[in-house]
């Protein structure tokens, strides 16, 4: 009772206790005694009444229960002073240290009605609790050994709509078992795309022959949200994102396809009271950089894999078109640098001469010495062909032709330069029988931060599904592993250069005046918004809330709100640019290709 009260005070909505917690799992043949069975029943009634004072919280407890002359190992769902349902353990182990068949009968599919303390209660292995009017929070139960079998009941539960699986367990500790248990629970939550609450026995059990460590776990879709340290008997709390679970299942067209008919049995949906809605401080961790692993070893492995995907995508395109020359507009910025590095790798795999990589630098009104020099040095260190074409004269002629005043620095002024550059790249591609390699990244495409038919257009966009926050790490990884000190120094300086299209004149001291993140907002925010919106269908209100948690030490709520509005408006307004994107390789779970992941009007 104290634990139930404590859970309520901690604003828990669902509380789970271990298998047979009312009596203890290690009673052995005492389970055959009428006194123990009767007292367990009486304790259930007592706990049922006790939950009446904690409105809107579901409590799941375990006990031995007699039905039709046989004893079952069951879980009982209690809420608002009522017993919502009873679920029996389906798989009774009788091997190694387990001899449960000596006392318990296996559970059954389907459901029957039993009377407990004057109330009709559903009892059976095909029971799902649906809370109030919510069509998302659906709870089902399996007990300990059920999970360790080849076909756990949770598979049936999930395929019939359960989004949260509760497992009441009495899993003892042996060498290495906790690691296996952790992977088992985590893996099942991933396989079933569900929340999985695993509550197991601890210090309250006998240690006659086995020891229990209270290794409690809460997982969600392959992620461990909370884990108790063994032998501490601590309760763990976590926030399960049911919206995310439902979004992922909705996206997966194969979630319930080609399933055996016995998996799609007639389930009983028990309508429960609403879970209490309370404002609480989320305990869930939200990564500020969801595209970038925190661990360096994992991050380096991710970078290598992404570079391989980009490289082999381009390699195949070059082979298929019998193309031995490429054309890249080199600005000295992040995106063109990454595109060049990928192209170099592709040429090396194909044993093509790097001189076939035509790097075109096209300085104009906003070009600074820093970016220009980095572009030149980088091209030289990589052994590619460098061509410099100053476009000031041609852009001025274009302004004169269309009647635009060069002193008016508006969108015409900026985009005229971008389209002039693209025209030059396309013509040089024809001149060299080559292919224009696109440099734009996914973050820019999500925001529409590209000139339509300017830098927006190419013949193959190698960065099209790489977010800006990841571009930096890819270049850093290349700099750290290229074994060329001079090239590495150039790449590091590129990383230190502010992101800019350099379409407006520089400051008087020659530094970059036009900084992208001052205009459209921080890319770390936009990548966070993009990831959660496209990957999990998170709406603006929820997105604002979780962004405030993730960036609590970086941005004020007002700043986050400002850039969230910017992202949302630009994302939908700029779809026309994404509708005609060039081909490019998908590298992660989020992409904006109109032919693949993002098909929207």
Regions found by a protein language model. Give the residues of each.
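ATP/NTP-dependent adenylation/nucleotidyl-transfer catalytic domains that generate, transfer
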Residues: 135-137, 193-194, 206, 220, ...
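Enzyme catalytic cores with a strong preference for nitrogen-chemistry domains
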Residues: 1-329, 345-354, 386
């Amino acid at each position: 009772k104290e634990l139930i009260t404590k859970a309520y005070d901690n604003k828990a909505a669902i509380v789970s206790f271990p298998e047979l917690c009312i009596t203890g799992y290690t009673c052995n043949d005492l389970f055959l005694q009428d006194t123990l069975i009767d007292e367990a029943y009486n304790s259930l009634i007592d706990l049922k009444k006790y939950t009446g004072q904690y409105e809107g919280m579901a409590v799941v407890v375990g006990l031995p229960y007699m039905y039709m002359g046989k004893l079952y190992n069951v879980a009982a769902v209690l809420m608002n002073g009522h017993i919502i349902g009873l679920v029996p353990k389906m798989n009774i182990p009788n091997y190694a240290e387990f001899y449960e068949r000596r006392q318990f009968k296996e559970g059954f599919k389907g459901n029957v009605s039993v009377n407990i303390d004057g109330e009709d209660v559903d009892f059976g292995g095909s029971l799902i609790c649906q809370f109030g009017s919510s069509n998302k929070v659906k709870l089902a139960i399996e007990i300990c050994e059920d999970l360790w079998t080849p076909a756990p009941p949770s598979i049936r539960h999930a395929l019939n709509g359960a989004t949260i699986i509760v497992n009441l367990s009495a899993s003892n500790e042996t060498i290495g078992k906790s690691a296996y248990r952790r992977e088992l629970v985590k893996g099942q939550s991933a396989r079933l795309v569900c929340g999985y609450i695993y509550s197991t026995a601890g210090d309250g059990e006998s240690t006659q022959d086995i020891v229990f460590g209270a290794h409690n776990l809460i997982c969600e879709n392959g992620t461990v949200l909370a884990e108790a340290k063994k032998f501490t008997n601590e309760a763990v709390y976590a926030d399960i994102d049911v919206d995310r679970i439902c979004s992922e299942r909705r996206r997966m067209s194969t979630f319930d396809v080609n399933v055996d008919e016995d998996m799609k049995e007639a389930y009983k949906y028990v309508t429960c009271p609403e879970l209490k809605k309370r404002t609480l401080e989320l305990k869930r961790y939200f990564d500020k950089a969801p595209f970038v692993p925190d661990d360096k070893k994992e991050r380096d492995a991710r970078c290598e894999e992404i570079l391989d995907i980009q490289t082999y995508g381009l390699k195949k395109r070059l082979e298929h078109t019998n193309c031995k020359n490429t054309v890249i507009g080199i600005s000295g910025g992040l995106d063109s640098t990454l595109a060049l590095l990928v192209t170099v790798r592709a040429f090396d795999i194909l044993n093509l001469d790097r001189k076939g990589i035509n790097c075109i630098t096209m300085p104009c009104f906003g070009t600074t010495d820093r970016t220009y020099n980095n572009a030149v040095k980088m091209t030289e260190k990589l052994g590619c062909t460098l061509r410099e074409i100053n476009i000031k004269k041609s852009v001025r002629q274009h302004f004169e032709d269309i009647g635009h005043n060069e002193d008016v620095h508006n969108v015409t002024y900026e985009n005229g330069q971008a389209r002039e550059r693209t025209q030059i790249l396309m013509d040089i591609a024809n001149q060299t029988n080559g292919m224009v390699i696109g440099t734009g990244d996914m973050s820019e495409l999500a925001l529409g931060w590209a000139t339509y038919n300017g830098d927006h257009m190419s013949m193959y966009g190698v960065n099209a599904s790489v977010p800006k926050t990841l571009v930096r790490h890819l270049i850093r990884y290349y700099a750290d592993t290229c074994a060329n000190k001079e090239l590495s120094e150039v790449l590091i300086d590129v990383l230190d250069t502010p992101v800019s299209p350099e379409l407006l004149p520089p400051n008087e001291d020659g530094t970059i005046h036009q900084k992208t993140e001052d205009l459209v907002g921080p890319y770390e925010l936009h990548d966070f918004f993009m990831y959660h919106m496209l990957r999990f269908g998170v709406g603006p209100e929820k997105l604002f809330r979780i962004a405030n948690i993730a960036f609590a030490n970086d941005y004020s709520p007002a700043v986050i709100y400002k850039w969230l509005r910017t992202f949302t408006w630009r994302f939908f307004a700029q779809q026309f640019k994404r509708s005609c994107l060039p081909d490019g390789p998908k590298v992660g779970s989020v992409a904006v290709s109109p032919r693949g992941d993002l098909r929207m009007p």
